[in-house]
């Protein structure tokens, strides 16, 4: 998002990121993928509550604590949301969120080596590649699935999303191709983007019900930063609501947690 915003030369952008650099080989080397998602240095370390349907087990919920976020610690498998989900959103009232509306944006981000150009992007910053298919087990797996009554597809990010077939991966020239590599690092070269690493956001600062700034800790020091245009809370599906709740935005029912709720959502 910061990359797109800095394309407009009128604006400068600041990013507050609690994590650090992604230079380590455990992040950039695809075969080391299991390490960063299990390291406190790169992972927030969230876990679920005991799951009743799983005999009380507690599951790990890795979330990236490094530039690039979870795209720097995930398994690098690239899967779009299902087209029918986007269409359902639009049918439910989210105008402009149907799959025909979002498809151009998927294509704009992609630089995919496979797939039909009517469905896949070929010139975007996010490289998407296929692995080698010379192992006979690859074809055997797909054939076994077909014999069991499942569908097969050559491109699950194309026209037919359902089925067994080759995987798309965010890997380029043998390295992980994260959001940091695809978007952040090129944007940092423009001098329109300032990145604050090791910056732990505490809350959004409001004035007259309008977000004006951010309160954060930076290397142990309390700091505040103010925006002249907009503030975007893009901390992921767990940390974004957490920040908003600490800022007084959320359900009134959370007041028993000593969270001030000034703006009910």
Predicted regions and their residues:
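N-terminal redox-cofactor-binding region of secreted/periplasmic oxidoreductases
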Residues: 1-257, 263
């Amino acid at each position: 998002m910061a990359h797109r915003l800095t394309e407009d030369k009128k604006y400068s952008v600041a990013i507050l990121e609690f994590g650090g650099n992604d230079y380590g080989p455990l992040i950039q080397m695809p075969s080391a993928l299991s390490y960063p998602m299990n390291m406190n240095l790169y992972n927030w370390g969230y876990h679920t509550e005991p799951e009743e349907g799983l005999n009380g087990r507690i599951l790990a919920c890795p979330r990236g604590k490094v530039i690039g976020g979870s795209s720097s610690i995930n398994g690098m498998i690239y899967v779009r949301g299902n087209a029918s989900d986007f269409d359902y959103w639009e049918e439910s009232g989210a105008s402009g969120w149907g799959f025909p509306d979002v498809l151009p944006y998927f294509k704009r981000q992609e630089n995919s080596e496979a797939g039909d150009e009517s469905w896949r992007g070929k010139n975007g910053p996010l490289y998407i590649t296929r692995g080698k298919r010379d192992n006979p087990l690859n074809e055997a797996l797909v054939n076994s699935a077909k014999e069991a009554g499942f569908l097969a597809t050559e491109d699950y990010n194309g026209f037919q999303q359902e089925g067994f077939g080759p995987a798309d991966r965010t890997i380029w020239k043998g390295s992980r191709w994260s959001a940091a590599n695809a978007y952040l690092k090129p944007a940092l070269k423009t001098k329109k983007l300032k990145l604050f690493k090791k910056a732990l956001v505490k809350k959004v600062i409001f004035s007259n019900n309008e977000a004006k700034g951010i309160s954060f800790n930076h290397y142990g020091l309390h700091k505040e930063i103010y925006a002249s245009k907009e503030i975007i809370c893009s901390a992921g599906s767990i940390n974004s609501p957490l920040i908003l709740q600490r800022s007084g935005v959320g359900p009134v029912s959370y007041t028993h947690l000593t969270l001030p709720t000034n703006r009910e959502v």
